[in-house]
Amino acid sequence: MNLPAKTFVILCILFLLDLCFSYIRHEWHSQNALQDMPVPSDLHPIVKQNADALKAAAANKGIDVVITEGFRSFKEQDELYKQGRTKKGNIVTYARGGESYHNYGLAIDFALQKKDGSIIWDMEYDGNQNGKSDWLEVVEIAKTLGFEWGGDWKRFKDYPHLEMIPN
């Protein structure tokens, strides 16, 4: 192999190594970002504001959204984590205390409320009779407000979950 070809190969390898290290650094930072934040005791004000905006925008479409969970303490999170493991019930979370966006006031869970007042988690329900799933209409609104939907996750689907990191 001549010198220019060797130089090109070495530069390509260095570029790929830099790319790999950048990715690893980004992933490490993302996973540890919550640990660096001070622990709040309520929803972040922007998350609360956007949760209220979500409810209002959904109501304008004839959909009644109920926020079933917001801020959750580390202790409450650990109790949920025990469910299906050391306590009776189904597993409802894979996050221990300190690992959930709920613990930092950055996540909400929602459900739909029918006209009779019952709370449902039915992703196919079309209470406003427009031919679309009310659940997915709410998700669409949430995404425009900056929320990430747990239903888009690859590993564990958490359909009622919405989270955000305010700018």
Curated annotation (Swiss-Prot):
One of its GO terms (cellular component) is plasma membrane. Optimum temperature is 37 degrees Celsius. Gene3D superfamilies: 3.30.1380.10. Residues 1-26 form the signal peptide. Transmembrane segments: none annotated. Its EC number is 3.4.-.-. InterPro entries: Bact_PeptidoProc_Enz, Hedgehog_sig/DD-Pept_Zn-bd_sf, Peptidase_M15C. Coiled coil: none annotated. Optimum pH is 6.5. Keywords: Cell membrane, Cell wall biogenesis/degradation, Hydrolase, Membrane, Signal. Pfam families: Peptidase_M15_4. It is found in: Cell membrane. SUPFAM superfamilies: Hedgehog/DD-peptidase. It comes from the Bacteria. GO terms for biological process: cell wall organization. GO terms for molecular function: peptidase activity. Belongs to the peptidase M15C family. Cleaves the linkage of the L-alanine-D-glutamic acid of B.subtilis cell wall. This is Peptidoglycan L-alanyl-D-glutamate endopeptidase CwlK. It comes from Bacillus subtilis (strain 168).
